[in-house]
């Protein structure tokens, strides 16, 4: 099955004709969502249970692991890594029990390069989340160089990591290629960030906002469709996440891809209009 959705559920005003959208409303259009709240702070079990009440049985969540896991931030105050991992796992257990967790996502920064030390760290990540499906996103193209590419893929397969299939700006020397490399046949993840060459490497207070300021055109969506179809030929489940939402374009692009692929999702939430 191919599930197409977006990052977050609350920032897609085009779905509801107002600034923010609710999870219940989002789940009337898309069957999967990526949540990054767990990247910034540890989720609370009560919030996880609340999310589950707002989505149908066939809806799936992708949860970003905490920033401390991917070397991009500090541990929660007063916690060791072991304590933080335990708290995280306890909080998401209701989602696991309900069968709604698609996978955990570990997105590493571009300074996380292909070195022996990085591979050793990924070994630790696998140990920390041994019982969970884990997708790994690599942002530096050193992992994709000819001398490392095959061994990198073999390593991902051995660890049962799903290497995230990424679309990002094409004109920068450090970005990774869009290649449908499936390293875990059970599930795959595609993340589409847009192709804003200038914004991708911008710095300053508006850097995050500009990084994903992009709207895919029809030709580019056709390229993404081909990548998704090639991925689906080698994976039982595929989750496609549009992250190009700085300008509110993710939901529109996601819906356009659903239409282009002629996917008709069943058992979504009823839309608000259908309730009256």
How should these model regions be labeled?
Residues 1-276:
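Residues lining hydrophobic/aromatic ligand-binding pockets adjacent to catalytic sites
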């Amino acid at each position: 099955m191919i599930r197409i959705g977006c990052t977050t559920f609350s920032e897609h005003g085009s779905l509801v004709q107002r600034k923010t959208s609710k999870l219940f409303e989002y789940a009337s259009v898309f069957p999967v969502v990526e949540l990054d709240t767990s990247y910034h702070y540890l989720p609370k079990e009560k919030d996880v249970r609340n999310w589950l009440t707002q989505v149908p049985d066939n809806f799936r969540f992708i949860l970003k692991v905490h920033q401390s896991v991917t070397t991009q931030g500090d541990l929660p105050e007063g916690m060791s890594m072991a304590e933080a991992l335990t708290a995280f796992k306890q909080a998401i257990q209701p989602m696991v029990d309900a069968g709604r967790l698609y996978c955990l996502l570990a997105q590493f920064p571009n300074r996380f390069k292909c070195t022996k030390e990085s591979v050793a760290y990924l070994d630790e990540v696998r140990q920390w989340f041994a019982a969970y499906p884990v997708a790994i996103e690599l942002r530096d193209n050193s992992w994709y160089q000819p001398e490392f590419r095959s061994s990198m893929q073999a390593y991902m397969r051995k660890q049962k990591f799903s290497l995230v299939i990424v679309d990002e700006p094409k004109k920068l020397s450090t970005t990774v290629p869009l290649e449908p490399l499936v390293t875990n046949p059970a599930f795959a993840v595609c993340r589409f960030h847009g192709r804003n060459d200038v914004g991708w490497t911008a710095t300053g207070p508006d850097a995050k906002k500009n990084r994903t300021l992009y709207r895919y055109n029809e030709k580019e969506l056709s390229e993404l469709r081909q990548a998704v179809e090639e991925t689906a030929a080698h994976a039982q489940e595929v989750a496609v996440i549009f992250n190009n939402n700085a300008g509110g374009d993710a939901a529109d692009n996601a819906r356009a891809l659903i239409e282009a692929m002629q996917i008709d999702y069943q058992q979504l939430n009823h839309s608000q209009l259908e309730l009256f």
